[in-house]
Amino acid sequence: MSENIDIVFITPNNSSGIYQELSNEYSAIETPTWSLLLAESCRSVGHKVSILDTLAENLSDDQTENRIKKLNPRIICFVVYGQNVNSGTTNMSGAIRLSSYLKNKNINAPIIFVGSHVQALPSQTLEKEKSIDIVCLNEGVYSIRNILKIKDFTFENLKNVKGIYFRDKDKI
């Protein structure tokens, strides 16, 4: 049975990409601080949220897909931050791999990315990565909450949300 939540915040796993074989035993696992902050911000105004920490749970893409299907979110948000300044860019490859996998599996929820890399290069990120529908500028707190107010994710509805870049078919 699906839960029908508003948004799932995903902390992507790129440990094998960063640490290669060392990740089997020695890779660090960061607390999903940014996912927790964003989730609580949305929860505090009445939205039903979930956090999926694919890094801590060491979930495969297939396992992640199954969990997302059970949650049945309106929106999927990849939180590509870290406590290290460079970790946003470092974690992008794992996040993009998973978002592409989900799009190829016909998960229909819009995919949002928030993080230091997409803040620095919002339009370039959308141009290069076709699996991403929306990127948030700044920390994403207010823009995500404003996106959650929208029932139908069309150009007309998204164009008035401040602090985002988004894809409308092939236009950014």
Show where each model-derived region lies.
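Short glycine-rich hinge loops at helix-strand junctions in the catalytic core
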Residues: 46
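Glycine-rich beta-alpha loop elements in corrinoid/cobalamin-binding modules
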Residues: 34, 38-42, 50-172
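Short glycine-rich His-centered loop
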Residues: 5-27
